[in-house]
Amino acid sequence: MKKGINRVVLVGTGAVGCSYAYCMINQAVAEEFVLVDVNEAKAEGEAMDLSHAVPFAPAPTRVWKGSYEDCKDADLVVITAGLPQKPGETRLDLVEKNAKIFKQIVRSIMDSGFDGIFLIATNPVDILTYVTWKESGLPKERVIGSGTTLDSARFRYMLGEYFDIGPHNIHAYIIGEHGDTELPVWSHVSVGIQKLQTLLEKDNTYNQEDLDKIFINVRDAAYHIIERKGATYYGIGMSLLRVTKAILNDENSVLTVSAYLEGQYGQKDVYIGVPAVLNRGGVREILEVELSEDEELKFDHSVQVLKETMAPVL
């Protein structure tokens, strides 16, 4: 790693990976950006195309098609490789197929001498982040999954539409599995500086029934998009960019990534979406917010589902 030069390696140049790559070049987040794919011609073509966008970016980025050897000097390796989710298929259905692929990828990366941070996006992301941690031998703080960052963004966007407030001023989180057992933390939602419950009590224009429908749309958003266009990639591309910036810029920002629990929320030995402080070292700390009794039960269920699904592939 050259002094003052950030290098990010992307493994997987499918729709998600390339959406992330375009975001990275567009915002000039790193000085060096390397694309790695089993289809080397595809990776080379994407690198060429992205390079031609560099003159329009706010700062130059050197982009090239590389190999696992380029991970040796990387600050961050982002993995989006793997089989995509098909219509009607849950994220957990992918576990055995993608776990096998991941073990090979992670071993190849570690053989290069990589000693940076992993950011995982491939589904089922919580389980594959755990697999990456186990295979890599890196500290848990430096293996991170995209978790429920996208779900939380969808949640804020849809709540913003409902309340006619910009999503940046909606403070709301989805936690748990990035999938069917995720849950909204209603007890900590605020619109601007006003708590959600206070707003509901003051204005009967809004009601919990509508809010419950919003969450269902958040939870099932990927299914709706996949039915219509075959895959989701813009939202997750921006989510990965946001996590990348939090890490490389040493922001100490709070994002709901997939992080390793060792007692927080009463759970151990699982990667799952929770609010965490991210900086140059990875996960600085996990923020343990007080959940309602119902939220606790749903979170515990989410953990249990992940552990049961994960057991056969470890």
Curated annotation (Swiss-Prot):
Broad class of where this protein is predominantly found: cytoplasm
Cell location: Cytoplasm
PANTHER family on file: L-2-HYDROXYCARBOXYLATE DEHYDROGENASE (NAD(P)(+)) (PTHR43128), L-LACTATE DEHYDROGENASE (PTHR43128:SF16)
Annotated residues for binding of beta-D-fructose 1,6-bisphosphate: 156, 171
Alphabetized PROSITE patterns for the sequence: L_LDH
Reaction catalyzed: (S)-lactate + NAD(+) = pyruvate + NADH + H(+)
Organism: Bacillus cereus (strain ATCC 14579 / DSM 31 / CCUG 7414 / JCM 2152 / NBRC 15305 / NCIMB 9373 / NCTC 2599 / NRRL B-3711)
Phosphotyrosine found at: 223
Record-stated family: Belongs to the LDH/MDH superfamily. LDH family.
Protein name: L-lactate dehydrogenase 1
Binding, NAD(+): 16, 37, 42, 68, 82-83, 121-123, 146
